Amino acid sequence: MFSVNNTHSSVSCSPSINSNSTSNEHYLRILTEWEKNSSPGEERGIAFNRLSQCFQNQEAVLNLSDLNLTSLPELPKHISALIVENNKLTSLPKLPAFLKELNADNNRLSVIPELPESLTTLSVRSNQLENLPVLPNHLTSLFVENNRLYNLPALPEKLKFLHVYYNRLTTLPDLPDKLEILCAQRNNLVTFPQFSDRNNIRQKEYYFHFNQITTLPESFSQLDSSYRINISGNPLSTRVLQSLQRLTSSPDYHGPQIYFSMSDGQQNTLHRPLADAVTAWFPENKQSDVSQIWHAFEHEEHANTFSAFLDRLSDTVSARNTSGFREQVAAWLEKLSASAELRQQSFAVAADATESCEDRVALTWNNLRKTLLVHQASEGLFDNDTGALLSLGREMFRLEILEDIARDKVRTLHFVDEIEVYLAFQTMLAEKLQLSTAVKEMRFYGVSGVTANDLRTAEAMVRSREENEFTDWFSLWGPWHAVLKRTEADRWAQAEEQKYEMLENEYSQRVADRLKASGLSGDADAEREAGAQVMRETEQQIYRQLTDEVLALRLSENGSRLHHS
């Protein structure tokens, strides 16, 4: 599976293929001609170097990500992994026959070419796809979220991971028996797909929240306890919810774990103009100017739901009871009006909040404040204040651990509104863990299932993991990397060079050694996992060394400390 955070994709190794001088010259001519036709902003020079090196050294992995490329040349035929995420590609060339992994996330693709039968992982998140080609029989992972898909082709029997959220699907094809993770939230689904009725050994997690499903099939109750199914945010009737509650509360219930929300079936889709919702947070003497500014954003994506979120936020217990809350929101809205990127991120975060209960709105407010702080860090606010950046990183780390703890707690409950669980840990531990982004009150703590003992255990776990893991985590944190790129450019370049040298000289052998030691040579799944582990270990080592060097210099200058008392 391709990583979404600090590590690159796992990779797999192909046998070396000898290329003669004639084919070398021919391919280099193709690359040279392609490089000459570069458009402004493209980094085809870097791409040329990586392509020629990959071809001449018969490297299994070709990484052309983050180069603003608008097209690709003919690809080396021997590669088994192609990474071209974060470019401006509108199409892909013919794919190599032995390709196993393709990552083309965050491009402008409207179609993708015929897929080779060898492909096991396809990741084309955040493109403009309206349909997919026939899927190869060996495919185990398919990530196509945030596209424009109206339907899916038949799913391969070996498929284990399927992400299709933020599309336009009204139905899903039958689900393969081996499917473990399905993320189909935020579509237009009106019915459930056909589930496998076999007894399962592996846990299955299926997410259908925020669709248009109104009823549940009778077979739903026949599923075994290996299933975790999220149906929150669907227009389910009160009768259906009551039936589910009776079913899951039975002492002899051994069926699936079902997630719902406190306001299912009661969503209110009415909203007022965005500018009106925003100006309501400002003093009367500022409202005219604010309204004029925000009128320009009325047609941005998720503007309507953001308007509804602001109205819901004003009705939370924090808005009513917390001194200075309105001023805090107004200051935040001013920052959004000045940054299109931050506004886009915030609109997206708030998109789901109006379709659930008040505590969902409160949790979303927490997440929006996190988004603001991380954005400010990435944009340079803390470039000259490493102590403040460390404090922010420490808070983000604590929140991440609390999310892990909440996730584990949710697994112990049968009929769960998971929002209440997540918010309970943040709200009830906000003071003890110094969580500046957490609201101090919530409405439905009583139904969260979180006990006083849970909170004591959580606090102890956060502090223990912080002591042992924080510096490693911080060394891989995106905002810290952004600071290093700006303020320590030479050191950062050296670290990146170390990483690419490892990819060229050590990576394949380390993966092969790991597979051999575990007796899993030739196992594609094990190969991907081993590749991801090797890559993460390498990045951890390189970035930790860089982090230690920079922090030792900066903290000694201002008297700050890395370790928190």
Curated annotation (Swiss-Prot):
Identify the stretch(es) annotated as Disordered: 1-22
Annotated GO molecular function terms are:
ubiquitin protein ligase activity
Q: Name one GO cellular component term.
A: host cell cytoplasm
Q: What is the active site of this protein?
A: C357
What result is annotated for mutating I181G? Abolished ability to ubiquitinate GSDMB
Stretch list, region Linker: 263-270
Which ranges carry the NEL domain? Answer: 273-565
Give the residue ranges for region: E3 ubiquitin-protein ligase catalytic domain.
Answer: 271-565
Q: DNA-binding among the record's keywords?
A: no
Q: What is the effect of changing C357A?
A: Abolished ubiquitin ligase activity and ability to ubiquitinate host Nlrp1b, GSDMB and GSDMD
User: Which consequence is recorded for altering N146A?
Assistant: Does not affect ability to interact with host GSDMB
EC number annotated for this UniProt entry = 2.3.2.27
- List the pathway annotation: Protein modification; protein ubiquitination
Any one Gene Ontology BP term: effector-mediated activation of host programmed cell death by symbiont
Q: Where is the composition biased (Low complexity)?
A: 9-22
**Location (main, coarse):** secreted
Known InterPro entries for this protein?
Leu-rich_rpt, LRR-bact_E3_ubiq_ligases, LRR_dom_sf, LRR_E3_ligase_N, NEL_dom
Q: Where are the LRR repeats?
A: 58-79, 80-97, 98-119, 120-137, 138-157, 158-179, 180-199, 202-223, 225-248
**Reactions this protein catalyses:** S-ubiquitinyl-[E2 ubiquitin-conjugating enzyme]-L-cysteine + [acceptor protein]-L-lysine = [E2 ubiquitin-conjugating enzyme]-L-cysteine + N(6)-ubiquitinyl-[acceptor protein]-L-lysine
Q: What is the effect of changing R125A?
A: Abolished ability to ubiquitinate GSDMB
**UniProt keyword Membrane present:** no
By sequence similarity, the record places it as follows: Belongs to the LRR-containing bacterial E3 ligase family.
The record's note on its domains: The LRR (leucine-rich repeat) domain forms a slightly curved solenoid and may mediate interaction with target proteins.
NCBIfam families per record: IpaH_Shig
- Record-given protein name: E3 ubiquitin-protein ligase ipaH7.8
Q: The organism's lineage?
A: Bacteria, Pseudomonadati, Pseudomonadota, Gammaproteobacteria, Enterobacterales
